[in-house]
């Protein structure tokens, strides 16, 4: 194999299967060699981590092949939609680093879809059905048994046209009539058994108000909207595989049987994102919010993009994660640890290192001059050779972590214990001399002596010492609230666990959720101390509290009351727990 062929082969192997399809379509000249995609969210909730995978695919394909990705809101159900969701969706997409070509709405095409439905009725391809939803469900049959025709299937065209007009005029109550496509009640594909394409909804629409009372169903609106916009590659998840023949049929019909092999959208499916310890159903997330089990859609424990953003995840870390898991044609449960690993990898390269003490005990350097204060130099990020530095004040009295001192330590304890030396990061080597306890035997002060010749940068500072501790000066620090967030669920597969609990106990989704919630998903610490460098920190600043984990200021944080959220611990502790 030549060097060029080897390179081409390597590039070919690196393409995911959707990219291979797109390249094949381009090579064959389909749709005039154009690539156009769309991201079509329904504005009925906040985007979650599962949507991020679809966003990266839709926008990524368009960018890679010089095309455009449009944003189209699938606003065909006014009972659940709101402008609030529209704005949050746009914010999340931009936060991920993408910009859409055009902003569209399915409601932009309501008139075209209506006209198309009228044409289908006139052509004998659609009819108004007056059966109840229960009757229609039974009449559709089963995957192994054909359906039976509706008694209204062959009603006169003029009658269906008249009733369809009444549906939209508000003269028909919700649930009393629907418009169905006339296809094949014996088809092995259940979606071909005269699917409902219009229903009555009297709730005002957030864009069109009371103009429409008859609304198109997703399967009817989606493919046609793709066609009207000029979408070439309609990318969606695997549950839509059975819908594809219907998608193609409706596109054939809207094209009136002309030029069927070109200038049309084609649907391709990839696996959706499934994560351990995560529940992604919008319906269940809404229960969490409404019942107060979390503090809103942007609660840092939520799998929403705004929740991850508030928790301190960077958009780049989510891109890294999506790249790692890739796109396939089969569903799998991905380990949440993979996402956290991507976050750690990204934040390690970008987070500013700072000192924070979460469980403080006072350390007094008995031989350090009283009243003396030194400014120590701390590198913001040692991973960056061009990293700036900041200063941190050092004095006689310091706060250290309570777990960094042990009066009677085991042999391999390398932190602070009487007679043992440790290094205070960016400062001096000190030797512990003892401690002071209260009446209950609790340590309230630790004592040590510093070696003035071991300041960071001095020759003696290179003396071999196994333990290095972080600290902040008692008189030169800021008090802070720290929120230690962890996984919301204590079960690996909350979706399956919830189904099992509900079946076993015949209980509601809410009751099942309460059984699965991790009681340690949020631990709030009030008596924490951070260095003064963080006085001006703001949300979306990426920080590493040295030796503890990655953190970010919360939106609740103020100069008078600093609040920090833990993004992720420095190491994966859940893997150890799950092995026990």
Label every model-predicted segment.
Residues 71, 75-77, 83, 105, ...:
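Active-site cores that bind ATP or allylic diphosphates and position pyrophosphate for catalysis
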């Amino acid at each position: 194999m030549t060097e060029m062929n080897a390179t081409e082969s390597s590039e070919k192997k690196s393409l995911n299967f959707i990219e291979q399809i797109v390249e094949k379509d381009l090579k064959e000249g389909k749709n005039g060699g154009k690539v156009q995609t769309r991201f079509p969210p329904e504005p009925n909730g906040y985007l979650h981590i599962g949507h991020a995978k679809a966003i990266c695919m839709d926008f990524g394909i368009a960018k890679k092949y010089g095309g455009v990705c449009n944003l189209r809101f699938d606003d065909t159900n006014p009972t659940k939609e709101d402008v609030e969701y529209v704005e949050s969706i746009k914010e999340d997409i931009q936060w991920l680093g993408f910009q859409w070509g055009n902003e569209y709405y399915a409601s932009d095409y309501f008139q075209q879809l209506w006209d198309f439905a009228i044409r289908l009725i006139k052509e004998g391809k659609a009819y108004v059905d007056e059966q109840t939803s229960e009757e229609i469900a039974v009449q559709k049959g089963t995957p192994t048994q054909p359906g039976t025709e509706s008694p209204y299937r062959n009603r006169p065209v003029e009658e269906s046209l008249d009733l369809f007009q009444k549906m939209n005029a508000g003269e028909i109550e919700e649930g009393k009539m629907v418009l169905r496509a006339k296809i094949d009640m014996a088809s092995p594909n259940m979606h071909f058994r005269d699917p409902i394409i219009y229903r009555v909804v009297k709730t005002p629409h957030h864009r069109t108000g009371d103009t429409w009372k008859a609304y198109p169903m997703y399967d009817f609106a989606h493919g046609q909207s793709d066609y009207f916009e000029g979408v070439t590659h309609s990318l969606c998840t695997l549950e839509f595989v059975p819908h594809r023949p219907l998608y193609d049929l409706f596109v054939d019909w809207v094209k009136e049987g002309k030029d069927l092999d070109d200038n049309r959208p084609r649907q391709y499916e990839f696996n959706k994102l499934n994560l351990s310890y995560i529940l992604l159903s919008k319906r269940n997330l809404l229960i969490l919010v409404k019942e107060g089990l979390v503090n809103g859609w942007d609660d840092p424990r939520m799998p929403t993009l705004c929740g991850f953003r508030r928790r301190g995840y960077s958009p780049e870390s989510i891109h890294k994660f999506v790249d790692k898991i890739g796109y396939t044609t089969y569903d799998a449960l991905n380990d949440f640890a993979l996402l956290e690993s991507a976050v750690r990898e990204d934040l390690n390269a970008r987070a500013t290192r700072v000192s924070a003490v979460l469980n403080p005990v006072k350390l007094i350097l008995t031989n350090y001059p009283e009243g003396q204060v030194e400014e120590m130099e701390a590198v913001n990020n040692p991973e960056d050779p061009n990293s700036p530095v900041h200063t941190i004040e050092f004095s006689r009295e310091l706060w250290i972590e309570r777990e960094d001192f042990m009066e009677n330590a085991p042999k391999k304890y390398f932190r602070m214990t009487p007679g043992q030396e440790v290094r205070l990061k960016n400062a001096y080597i000190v030797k512990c001399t003892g401690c002071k306890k209260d009446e209950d035997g609790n340590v309230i002060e630790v004592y040590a002596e510093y070696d003035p010749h071991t300041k960071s940068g001095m020759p003696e500072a290179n003396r071999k010492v196994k333990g290095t501790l972080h600290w902040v000066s008692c008189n030169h620090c800021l008090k802070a609230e720290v929120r230690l967030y962890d996984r919301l669920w204590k079960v690996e597969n909350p979706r399956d666990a919830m189904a099992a609990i509900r079946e076993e106990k015949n209980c509601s989704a809410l009751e099942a959720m309460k059984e699965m919630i991790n009681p340690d998903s949020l631990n709030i610490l009030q008596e924490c101390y951070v260095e003064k460098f963080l006085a001006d920190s703001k949300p979306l600043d990426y920080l590493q509290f040295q030796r503890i984990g990655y953190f970010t200021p919360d939106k609740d944080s103020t100069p008078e009351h600093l609040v920090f959220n833990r993004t992720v611990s420095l190491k994966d502790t859940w893997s150890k727990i799950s092995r026990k």
